[in-house]
Amino acid sequence: MEFQTVIEKRRSIRNFDPGKKVSREQIETLIRAASLAPSWKNLQTSRYYCVLSPSRIEEFRQKCLPESNQKNCAGAPALIITTFKKGIVGFDKATGSPVNEAGDGWGYYDLGLQNENLILKAAELDLGTLIMGIRDESAIREYLKIPETEIIVAVIAVGYPAAEPS
């Protein structure tokens, strides 16, 4: 598929087909594509936590997302939670001090580049995605046992669209 077509095809999906599953291999393909994005000094501090079983997805939705996003990702057969290790990207290794005023902003920047690669690869594979930033960080951290050394940024629902997005 032409790159321009992928860019134009990608849409936020809020209506997933619950009858179509996404394989572990497809999720691994998305994460591999994400990891090819540029990052500060190639430090690759982004982390991906995947919720793939239907019962765990339902439990995660109920415990970690507000009602609006519970509805928005209903039927999605995969959730990918994206984080990055704080205090590394944009920081001097020797002193631990930020190299400029952006500080951990560079970690957000790198993860944003990687998340875009992930969702564009999903579009190429005819998968739909929805990036959700409204979520309960402490509930996610507890549910997935994410260490305090990582900043939780987004939850990405992945699945097949139930209808063609407009």
Predicted segments, located by residue:
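C-terminal helix-cap and adjacent tail motif
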Residues: 3-13, 18-21, 88, 154-166
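Alpha-helix/helix-capping structural signal
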Residues: 11, 55, 135-138
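An N-terminal domain-cap segment
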Residues: 13-37
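Glycine/small-residue-rich phosphate/adenosyl-binding loop
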Residues: 26, 42-112
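Small-aliphatic-rich amphipathic alpha-helix that forms the alpha element of a beta-alpha
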Residues: 30, 34-35, 80, 95, ...
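Short secondary-structure junction motifs
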Residues: 43-46, 124-127, 153
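A glycine-rich helix N-cap at a beta->alpha junction
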Residues: 69-80, 145-166
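Short secondary-structure boundary segments
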Residues: 84, 134, 160
